[in-house]
């Protein structure tokens, strides 16, 4: 009996083993136990059974002892146990892929029989191995894998041990069965070391990695008919891993992986070409269904349950997965590598990388375009990627259809080519390319169109991660800070959302057909990532990666490895970002001001970066509109070479942008133009990565300050949110790609210059493309006719006007910025830090590589319609409180369009306005003291659309202006301020909307006419004497709800033209309307931010004085959200007045001691009697407003055009500003300003902006700036032109701005040259006056025709006029030496009179007449001698100036140090 069984065992095991004889088998038949010793397994059979990749081969497998235990009576429920003691396997890598694997021996043994009892028993075998040692020999290294306590067993669908009958799910209707296996081990030890060779001197440290308990879960789907495996799902699960790698070990790992990459890539291509057809199982399912129909019809309920269970655990396609719950990776420097420490800036550094829930999925056989809902970790990111990829596939299919038609037309219209006339690469057999006759084309195309396009996808997910800053031994021991991390928890994002999601997809045909295939695509999603700039970490990482790259290059050179990376192949890329944050911190000081920020953060709500045109706001039409906006500005024209630009600037608007916007850079465009012969091969529709045009779009982009003590842990706004678009192209790389040898199927890449018709024809109408071009291009003859020599538009040759990278930056909406002194100091410090960091990075690159860093040129264009910069300054000292508030407030600025000789008219006008304001004030005070006071808050009044206004010639006033707008500063001038109220009137400095520099929107309105124009007004009216009339519209109350008093603009504003006589408003000038909203309605960011020193929500406390006829009302508290809702619900013609709680003064007097401060809308405070509770509340609010009081100066900027040219170390910044209008708000509560400031730009100002710029700036730095000054290379050289500029300033604002710009340290000297021409500035002295002085100083108007201010390297300022500037002889130096000097230490400003005396010349006298003043000069010398002498003198003068500048700097530093010591 034993002999018979031995023969059967030999019969089956002989297929797996070598030299197996009966004497090696010990068998106990009754016990069901057997033992085999010294088994040598067959390598090829194991390769087929394990289905190893073809780049790996098994050389030898040996097992010292194997035992088997068979439970004869329980074969259905219990597995056969196979135990192996020690298995040794020797393997090697193949440089060329070996022959593909054959059929599995298990399937062969079953004789293609159906899935029966024997197959179930064999499949349920349980295997245990004490030790497995796998040795792999490769070209560059040797590796070994040692596994201990390996177990292989069958489990149920929930991965639990149990009865064998539950380890499989069989569906007779499908004719398929699912089986579940699990493999686990206690430990795996991995070692790798370089190959020892005498002629190779590559020294690599050995790599040793150890993992703890891990497991693999396998799900197999077989066919019942023949037991063949249809699909497999394999999941490798690794628990917590902690690996420490030195830089030498990491280098070794990268080198080993690189040595295998070429073989793995070849093997992958072989696998794709022999991939199984995905529809094989469908036919089997149908046949199996017919066979099993009679068996399954009897038990429909049971079958439904089986089908449901099978569907729940079905494996629809083969996939492999890696799951790591937590991975800690520590990378550190080699402590023994002393020879490298001299070159390293940071030595002994270590960095920790922590990854949580890392998963990698691989789907090798996914049909292109099919659903991915069955994927293991299907999520919203996968759904978004699928939608984007399907759009790409649809576009590709349309191109293929057009290509087929082009091939057909080409073969019909041209005779067949003979092989002798074609290039060798084009000589193809009829099988490979059968398009030689017109009769065969349709059948071939129909056959190829039925080919099934497959895709291979790799998905990487990362739930959370932390990359910590580098730590060194010199640092104090503390927990490391994050450099890159995920903020999902702080932003309350779903836990199932991945921090990083990356999916890469490639396409192929299973049979390896030479047919067009789509470009691979890469989709990435970044959620709530925060990047923190850490100087030490960036420098250490830069050195680490440079050293790694250098060692890899040496390794590849030694082993003669080819760099087969497909960097030049186009890949469709899309990167989505959600709530990304970029933080730039500053050095933390132990003691700092409460308004001193610790960091600046750059954030965006949503971001898209892509090189495809299938994403929102990144399409061809978006680029076309943006390009047209840039093209409409003369500043960006190639022919614009006037200041601030020059003829050396790059051509920003490169033709690549224009061609891409009109879809003229595609392969199909070239095919229909006749420049490429149409062929149906794999690379016909593929393009180079050099032709990519990238688009980056931020839906909301903003900048905050962080770490301010006054902010109470919340970020403080710096730049309010705005949408941002960036478009990028690479002209230099594109031109280089065109120089490379073209494939022979391309006739030429030249394109006709007749753009007019091409620009109009859009490739979106792809079906009409052929008809369109058939009338434009010449007929093709044999596909070899080249276009004319004039068709050179498409080929770009690199020139000095092209940079490596061109960027178009477009800001779509109005930009608002606010900054105080300490925030300004932070920006200066961060600017210096970033410059130092870039310099250190450049030096490290040169030190590691031994060669200069690559000089990259970048051209950046910036287009901004309007902006607003608010300077938050210290409060201005107020005037004497005993004076009349109106006498100090009324200082109307003389309109520029009025002649200066009209003194009487202006004087009478001032008196009239003063009387008007006094009348309004007295009426308001009396009205408040009459127990009917109220507060009018115009910050929430919805105004009409300014575009709907009638011209001033019809009505003189727009109907949409509310009543209180006429009380604003635009009509009444500057009203004096009240410290107790925390409100301010705006100064009449004009608006952005002024059409020319000579006109301001300052209107002098007869207030009595405004208030008195309709005596029958049922809302509010005053008589001509200023007495109060009846307030007929009583204030109604609804419990504790909002109290509203509605002014109707139609009733308050006249339509009769007779009012125009009292208003003196120009027909062309209409005051712009400001729409004021609460801050909550402005913030488009999904985060909580607050203005400086404010609570998170802007709360307005509203109250009203009650009359006897009114009900008792409680104090009403309204937050900004309620205000916003009511504003949205109200009619646009109504003006809501929310009654605001007044600030109670301690004094009992009725007059106002100091002026009120009201922001852009009159808030009239009540000073009547209040309850004790209200008094305490008011006193707290008054204290809060007083602490929050700041002087605000707003610069409204219109039309900003900028260009930044970077050539290696040289940087040129050209900036042009059409119009700048300062708006001096005076002392104002910061809360009111930030909550009530306008959100958008003034459309009228944008439309009527100046054609000629008021301010032009040019800044140069780097070695190229030495032509201006020796110091300019380091500190830069600034040139500024101010032309046709007209404005007004208060002396208090100028002094405040000076304090704002003061630095804590001695500022570096920046050479500069400033030209001011045709400029007028009105100066108003608003400094505090003594009580004895009743008259205030008259405004001073300064006219500057032409003035030049220069600053040299020694810090001195030189002031001269245009005549001195235009001289070109050597006398210029003498006059320059005699000109007025403004030393940086003293800032001694001389008067204009002393300038004329110091120069001792008259500007009107020509230079030749001045030769008498210089008798020592003789003009007999030749011009060449004089120029040579002049140059030598200039050099000596420059040296002297440098020495003087150093002396000045040293002196200033000492004075600063002495001053600091004195203060301390």
Curated annotation (Swiss-Prot):
It is found in: Cytoplasm, Cytosol; Early endosome. Keywords: Coiled coil, Cytoplasm, Endosome, Phosphoprotein. InterPro entries: BLTP3A/B. Monomer. Homodimer (via N-terminus). Associates with the Golgi-associated retrograde protein (GARP) complex. Interacts with GARP complex component VPS52. Interacts (via C-terminal coiled-coil domain) with STX6. GO terms for molecular function: GARP complex binding; lipid transfer activity; protein homodimerization activity. Pfam families: BLTP3A_B. It comes from Homo sapiens (Human). Residues 278-297, 1164-1182, 1394-1413 have a biased composition (Polar residues). The modification Phosphoserine is found at residues 414, 418, 774, 935, 1009. Tube-forming lipid transport protein which mediates the transfer of lipids between membranes at organelle contact sites. Required for retrograde traffic of vesicle clusters in the early endocytic pathway to the Golgi complex. Residues 3-94 form the Chorein N-terminal domain. PANTHER family: BRIDGE-LIKE LIPID TRANSFER PROTEIN FAMILY MEMBER 3B, CHOREIN N-TERMINAL DOMAIN-CONTAINING PROTEIN. Residues 267-297, 409-436, 1066-1089, 1164-1183, 1392-1413 are annotated as: Disordered. It comes from the Eukaryota. One of its GO terms (cellular component) is early endosome. Residues 1418-1456 form a coiled coil. This is Bridge-like lipid transfer protein family member 3B. The keyword Coiled coil applies. One of its GO terms (biological process) is intermembrane lipid transfer.
């Amino acid at each position: 009996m034993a002999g018979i069984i031995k023969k059967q065992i030999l019969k089956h095991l002989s297929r797996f083993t070598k030299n197996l004889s009966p004497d090696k088998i010990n068998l106990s038949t009754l016990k069901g136990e057997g033992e085999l010793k010294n088994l040598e397994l067959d390598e090829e059979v194991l390769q087929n059974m394990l289905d190893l990749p073809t780049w790996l081969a098994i050389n030898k497998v040996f097992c010292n002892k194997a035992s088997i235990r068979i439970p004869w009576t329980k074969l259905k429920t219990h597995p056969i146990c196979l135990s192996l003691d020690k298995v040794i396997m020797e393997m090697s890598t193949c440089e060329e892929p070996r022959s593909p694997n054959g059929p599995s021996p298990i399937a062969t043994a079953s004789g293609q029989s159906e899935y029966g009892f024997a197959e179930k028993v064999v499949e349920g075998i349980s295997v245990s191995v004490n030790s497995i040692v796998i040795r792999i020999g490769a070209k560059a290294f040797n590796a070994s894998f040692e596994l201990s306590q390996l177990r292989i067993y069958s489990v149920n669908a929930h991965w639990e041990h149990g009865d064998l009958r539950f380890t499989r799910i069989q569906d007779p209707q499908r004719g398929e069965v699912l089986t579940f296996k699990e493999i686990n081990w206690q430990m795996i030890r991995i070692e790798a070391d370089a190959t020892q060779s005498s002629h190779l001197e590559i020294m690599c440290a050995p790599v040793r990695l150890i993992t703890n308990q891990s497991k693999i879960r396998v799900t197999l789907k077989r066919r019942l008919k023949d037991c063949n495996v249809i699909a497999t799902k394999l999941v490798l699960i690794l628990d917590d891993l902690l690996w420490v790698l030195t830089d030498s070990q990491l280098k070794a790992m990268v080198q080993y992986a690189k040595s295998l990459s070429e073989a793995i890539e070849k093997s992958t291509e072989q696998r794709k070409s022999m991939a199984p057809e995905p529809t094989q199982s469908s036919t089997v399912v149908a046949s199996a269904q017919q066979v099993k129909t009679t068996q399954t019809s009897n038990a429909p309920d049971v079958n439904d349950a089986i089908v449901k269970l099978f569907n729940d655990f079905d494996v629809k396609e083969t996939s492999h997965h890696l799951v790591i719950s937590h991975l800690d990776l520590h990378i550190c420097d080699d402590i023994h590598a002393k020879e490298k420490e001299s070159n390293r800036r940071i030595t002994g550094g270590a960095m920790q990388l922590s990854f949580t829930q890392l998963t990698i999925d691989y789907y090798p056989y996914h049909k292109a375009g099919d659903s991915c809902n069955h994927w293991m970790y299907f999520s919203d990111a996968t759904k978004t990627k699928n939608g984007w990829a399907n759009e790409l596939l649809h576009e590709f299919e349309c191109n293929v259809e057009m290509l087929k038609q082009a091939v057909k037309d080409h073969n019909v219209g041209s005779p067949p080519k003979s092989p002798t006339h074609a290039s060798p690469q084009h000589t193809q057999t009829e099988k490979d390319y059968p398009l030689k006759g017109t009769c065969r084309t349709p059948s071939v195309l129909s056959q190829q169109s039925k080919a099934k396009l497959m895709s291979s996808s790799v998905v990487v997910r990362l739930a959370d991660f932390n990359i910590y800053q580098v730590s060194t031994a010199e640092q104090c021991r503390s927990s490391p800070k994050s450099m890159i991390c995920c903020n999902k928890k702080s932003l309350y994002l779903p836990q199932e959302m991945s921090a990083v999601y990356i999916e890469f997809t490639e396409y192929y045909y299973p049979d390896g057909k030479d047919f067009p295939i789509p470009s691979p695509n890469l989709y990435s999603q970044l959620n709530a990532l925060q990047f923190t700039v850490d100087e030490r970490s960036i420098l250490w990482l830069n050195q680490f990666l440079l050293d790694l790259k250098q060692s890899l290059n040496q390794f590849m050179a030694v082993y003669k490895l080819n760099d087969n990376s497909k960097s030049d192949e186009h890949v469709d890329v899309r990167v989505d970002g959600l709530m990304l944050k970029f933080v730039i911190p500053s050095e933390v000081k132990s003691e700092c001001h409460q308004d001193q920020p610790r960091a600046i953060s750059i954030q965006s709500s949503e971001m898209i970066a892509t090189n495809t045109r299938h994403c929102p706001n990144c399409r061809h039409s978006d680029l076309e509109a943006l390009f047209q906006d840039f093209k409409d500005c003369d500043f960006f024209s190639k022919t614009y070479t006037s200041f601030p630009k020059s003829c050396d600037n790059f051509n920003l608007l490169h033709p690549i942008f224009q061609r891409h916007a009109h879809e003229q850079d595609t392969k199909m465009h070239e095919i229909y133009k006749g420049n490429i012969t149409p062929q149906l091969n794999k690379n016909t529709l593929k393009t180079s990565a050099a032709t990519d045009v990238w688009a980056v779009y931020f839906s909301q982009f903003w900048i905050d300050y962080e770490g301010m003590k006054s902010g109470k842990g919340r970020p403080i706004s710096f730049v309010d949110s705005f949408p941002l678009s960036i478009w990028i192209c690479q002209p230099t790389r594109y031109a280089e790609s065109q120089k490379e040898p073209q494939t022979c199927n391309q006739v030429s890449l030249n394109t006709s210059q007749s753009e007019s018709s091409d620009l109009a024809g859009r490739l979106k109408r792809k079906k009409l493309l052929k008809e369109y071009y058939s009338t434009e291009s010449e007929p093709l003859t044999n596909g070899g006719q080249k276009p004319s020599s004039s068709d050179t538009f498409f080929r770009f040759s690199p020139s000095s006007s092209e940079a490596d990278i061109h960027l178009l930056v477009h800001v779509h909406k109005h930009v608002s910025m606010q900054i105080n002194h300490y925030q300004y100091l932070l920006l200066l410090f961060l600017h210096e830090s970033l410059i130092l960091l870039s310099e250190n990075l450049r030096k490290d690159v040169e030190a590691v590589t031994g060669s200069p860093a690559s000089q990259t040129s970048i051209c950046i264009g910036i287009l901004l319609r309007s902006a607003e910069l608010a300077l938050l300054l210290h409060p201005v000292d107020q005037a004497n409180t005993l004076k009349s508030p109106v006498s100090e407030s009324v200082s109307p600025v003389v309109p520029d369009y009025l002649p200066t000789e009209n003194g009487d008219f202006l004087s009478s006008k001032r008196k009239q306005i003063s009387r008007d304001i006094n009348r309004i004030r007295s009426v308001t005070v009396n009205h408040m003291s009459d127990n009917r006071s109220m507060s009018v808050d115009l910050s929430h009044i919805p105004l009409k659309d300014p575009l709907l206004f009638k011209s001033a010639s019809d009505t003189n006033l727009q109907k949409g202006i509310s009543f209180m707008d006429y009380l604003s500063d635009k009509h009444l001038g500057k009203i004096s301020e009240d410290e107790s109220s925390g409100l301010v009137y705006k100064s009449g400095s004009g608006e952005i909307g002024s059409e020319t520099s000579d006109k301001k929107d300052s209107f002098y309105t007869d207030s009595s006419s405004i208030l008195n124009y309709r005596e029958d007004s049922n809302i509010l009216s005053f008589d001509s004497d200023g007495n109060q009339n009846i307030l007929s519209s009583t204030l109604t109350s609804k419990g504790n709800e909002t109290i509203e008093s509605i002014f109707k603009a139609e009733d308050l504003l006249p339509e009769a033209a007779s009012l125009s006589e009292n208003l003196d408003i120009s027909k062309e000038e209409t005051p712009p309307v400001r729409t004021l909203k609460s801050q909550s309605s402005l913030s488009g960011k999904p985060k909580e931010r607050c203005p400086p020193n404010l609570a998170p929500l802007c709360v307005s406390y509203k109250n009203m004085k009650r009359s006897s006829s009114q009900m008792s009302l409680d104090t009403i508290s309204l937050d900004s959200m309620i205000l916003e809702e009511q504003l949205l619900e109200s009619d646009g013609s109504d003006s809501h007045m929310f009654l605001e709680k007044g600030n109670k003064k301690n004094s009992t007097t009725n007059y106002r001691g100091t002026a009120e401060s009201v922001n852009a809308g009159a808030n009239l405070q009540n000073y009547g009697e209040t309850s004790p509770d209200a008094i305490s509340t008011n006193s707290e609010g008054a204290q809060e407003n007083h602490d929050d009081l700041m002087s605000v100066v707003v610069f409204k900027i219109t039309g900003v055009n900028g260009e930044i040219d970077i050539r290696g170390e040289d940087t040129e910044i050209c900036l042009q500003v059409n119009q700048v209008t300062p708006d001096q708000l005076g002392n104002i509560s910061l809360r009111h300003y930030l909550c009530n400031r306008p959100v958008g730009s003034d459309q009228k100002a944008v439309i009527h902006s100046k054609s000629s710029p008021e301010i032009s700036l040019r800044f140069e730095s780097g070695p190229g700036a030495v032509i201006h000054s020796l110091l300019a290379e380091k500190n830069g050289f600034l040139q500024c032109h101010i032309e046709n500029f007209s404005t007004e300033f208060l002396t208090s604002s100028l002094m405040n701005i000076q304090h704002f710009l003061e630095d804590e340290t001695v500022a570096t000297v920046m050479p500069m040259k400033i030209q001011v021409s045709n400029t007028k500035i009105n100066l108003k002295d608003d400094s505090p006056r003594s009580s004895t002085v009743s008259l205030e100083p008259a405004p001073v108007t300064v006219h500057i025709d032409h003035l030049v201010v220069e600053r040299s390297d020694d810090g001195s300022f030189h002031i001269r006029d245009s005549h001195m500037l235009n001289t070109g002889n050597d006398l210029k130096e003498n006059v320059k030496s005699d000109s007025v000097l403004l030393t940086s230490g003293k800032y001694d400003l001389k008067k204009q009179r002393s300038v004329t005396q110091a120069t001792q010349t008259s500007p009107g006298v020509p230079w030749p007449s001045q030769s008498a003043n210089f008798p020592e000069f003789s003009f007999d010398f030749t011009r060449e001698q004089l120029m040579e002498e002049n140059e030598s003198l200039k050099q000596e003068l420059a040296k002297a100036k440098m020495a003087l500048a150093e002396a000045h700097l040293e002196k200033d530093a000492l004075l600063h140090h002495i001053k600091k010591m004195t203060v301390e």
